[in-house]
């Protein structure tokens, strides 16, 4: 006899397993994202608990390649509230990112071009693992931001006009 599964329960479980934990919305405004890469992140236990509680800030973060390894700098993960001061982590410590060697080499080749940088875009759950999506971005000038805003406004007006008719 076939199983009569509860589709709503499985969809909810799948959504919980792929939950967004922190997002860097400012990065998409300040940079034109050319390429993205999902990486693992090396964390200690209190960092995991703080991230799952939504206590991570990616706004000022950036990534570097040092000694052939990807490193995440300047990302603030608040100390866990229930751990003592001795067992807690340093909120701004440098964290190692986990990626394949060929992916790191590809990023290094692209970073040699002028004006490109690696920025963290979001922290999310993938199953029980915390993953970080990093983006290869090119900084936007003020006039680029204005043009983008004008284009978005025009698209909104067109959609609203089409919705009326």
From Swiss-Prot:
Residues 141-165 are annotated as: Disordered. It comes from the Bacteria. One of its GO terms (biological process) is trans-translation. One of its GO terms (cellular component) is cytosol. InterPro entries: SmpB, SsrA-bd_prot, SsrA-bd_prot_CS. Keywords: Cytoplasm, RNA-binding. Residues 145-159 have a biased composition (Basic and acidic residues). It is found in: Cytoplasm. Transmembrane segments: none annotated. Its main location: cytoplasm. Required for rescue of stalled ribosomes mediated by trans-translation. Binds to transfer-messenger RNA (tmRNA), required for stable association of tmRNA with ribosomes. tmRNA and SmpB together mimic tRNA shape, replacing the anticodon stem-loop with SmpB. tmRNA is encoded by the ssrA gene; the 2 termini fold to resemble tRNA(Ala) and it encodes a 'tag peptide', a short internal open reading frame. During trans-translation Ala-aminoacylated tmRNA acts like a tRNA, entering the A-site of stalled ribosomes, displacing the stalled mRNA. This is SsrA-binding protein. It comes from Prochlorococcus marinus (strain MIT 9313). The gene is smpB.
